[in-house]
């Protein structure tokens, strides 16, 4: 069970990112973090186990991408792919905070995809699908936004997912370092139009 102080930390951290979470969203995010903490060792979801680390390194890190995501989608009900989702980050966070989105989380590790599906069911997130697949072999309708966090280099990320991107769609890579170097390695037809500090 997550500590009450974490709710305050989540609310304040989100506010610092320009997000006003509802009580319901805060509760769902904390329950999700609790699921990661409880099942993390069993499913090898993440190296982080401490509640404060889950808050800062996973929840708030994923929430930081919500304002640019909202600017891009304009609040429309679009399809989002989370490539290499792991524990469902950032896909489940997007689904909680932006319920209008149709989010598909894909991971090559079956137990991680199973965790995402179970977490979505326990949190009653009807806008989430989990797929156990290699993203480069993913079939089906294209996605308006393809996101990744700690997945691959920008060049590999775009190459592996290009077939799944809808015309006019965008890639959203949550990257902490090497952005300029990786951007220089992108195919010439890929335009990098925004970098969030």
PLM features per residue range, with description:
Residues 13, 26, 97, 185-189:
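Alpha-helical structural signal in soluble globular domains
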Residues 87-100:
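Conserved SAM-binding loop of SAM-dependent methyltransferases across substrates and taxa
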Residues 100-197:
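S-adenosylmethionine
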Residues 1-75, 81, 111-112, 118-128:
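Class I SAM-dependent transferase core
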Residues 72-76, 138-141:
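Glycine-rich phosphate-binding loop signature in dinucleotide/nucleotide-binding domains
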Residues 82-86:
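Conserved S-adenosyl-L-methionine
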Residues 36, 94, 174-175:
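Residue-level signal for inorganic ion chemistry
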């Amino acid at each position: 069970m997550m500590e009450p102080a974490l709710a305050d930390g989540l609310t304040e951290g989100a506010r610092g990112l320009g997000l006003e979470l509802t009580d319901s969203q805060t509760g769902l995010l904390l329950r999700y973090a609790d699921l990661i903490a409880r099942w993390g060792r069993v499913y090898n979801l993440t190296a982080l186990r401490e509640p404060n680390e889950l808050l800062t390194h996973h929840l708030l890190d994923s929430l930081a991408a919500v304002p640019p995501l909202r600017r891009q989608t304009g609040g429309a009900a679009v399809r989002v792919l989370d490539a290499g989702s792991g524990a469902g980050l950032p896909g489940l966070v997007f689904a909680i905070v932006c319920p209008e989105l149709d989010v598909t989380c894909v991971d090559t590790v079956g137990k991680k995809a199973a965790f995402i599906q179970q977490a979505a069911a326990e949190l009653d997130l009807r806008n989430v699908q989990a797929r156990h697949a290699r993203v480069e072999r993913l079939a089906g309708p294209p996605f308006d936004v393809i996101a990744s966090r700690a997945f691959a280099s920008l060049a590999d990320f775009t190459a592996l997912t290009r077939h799944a991107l809808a015309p006019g769609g965008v890639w959203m890579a949550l990257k902490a370092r090497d952005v300029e170097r990786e951007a220089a390695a992108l195919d010439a037809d890929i335009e990098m139009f925004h970098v969030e500090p």
